[in-house]
Amino acid sequence: MNLTLYAVNAFLILDSSGKRIFTKYYAPPHLKEGEGGVFNSVKEEKTFEKGLFEKTWKTQNDILTYDGKLVVMLTVMDVIFYIVGGMEENEVMLYECLRSIRDALELLFKYVPDKRTLLENYDQLVIVVDETIDDGVILETEPALIAARVTKGPVSEAQAIVSDFKEMGFMNSFQKAREKITERILKGTF
């Protein structure tokens, strides 16, 4: 039984031919090299990925064991999302983490992520994964919160006001605009 918070050994996104789009491996600080899913080299990581892809390419299973690890996968368009954990991990928790990353990406991109979209928005992909998993610890599983942390805030005050108006009704918006204009007239900046 795993009593630590370190649930994730790796998060992978491979394309339909098994090539890397995104990979991130996590090494819990209390384990030594070679223990508990920690790979010693990129060559070992790629060998693991190739074998995993070959085993899962034609399967419809979402959860499986491979190389002594629990693997949860999700196929989306032309990419496959994998999350790898130890055999003692809760597969429902891992699946929820994987699904939340996929859903956060859908919220950000406004449609289902495919290979091209992921590569074009690689910076947002990296931030989504980092906001969800930190050193193998699952931090957040609510897609809307993850996406909100990734999106950029308003750049200027005018954009902030427009953003606020979208959230308010017409009368509230009118009142807010009236207050802002009055405030600027009194300051002499209008």
From Swiss-Prot:
InterPro entries: AP_mu_sigma_su, Coatomer_zeta, Longin-like_dom_sf. GO terms for biological process: intra-Golgi vesicle-mediated transport; intracellular protein transport; retrograde vesicle-mediated transport, Golgi to endoplasmic reticulum. It is a peripheral membrane protein. Coiled coil: none annotated. Keywords: Cytoplasm, Cytoplasmic vesicle, ER-Golgi transport, Golgi apparatus, Membrane, Protein transport, Transport. SUPFAM superfamilies: SNARE-like. One of its GO terms (cellular component) is nucleus. Its main location: cytoplasm. It is found in: Cytoplasm; Golgi apparatus membrane; Cytoplasmic vesicle, COPI-coated vesicle membrane. It comes from the Eukaryota. Oligomeric complex that consists of at least the alpha, beta, beta', gamma, delta, epsilon and zeta subunits. The coatomer is a cytosolic protein complex that binds to dilysine motifs and reversibly associates with Golgi non-clathrin-coated vesicles, which further mediate biosynthetic protein transport from the ER, via the Golgi up to the trans Golgi network. Coatomer complex is required for budding from Golgi membranes, and is essential for the retrograde Golgi-to-ER transport of dilysine-tagged proteins. The zeta subunit may be involved in regulating the coat assembly and, hence, the rate of biosynthetic protein transport due to its association-dissociation properties with the coatomer complex. Belongs to the adaptor complexes small subunit family. This is Probable coatomer subunit zeta.
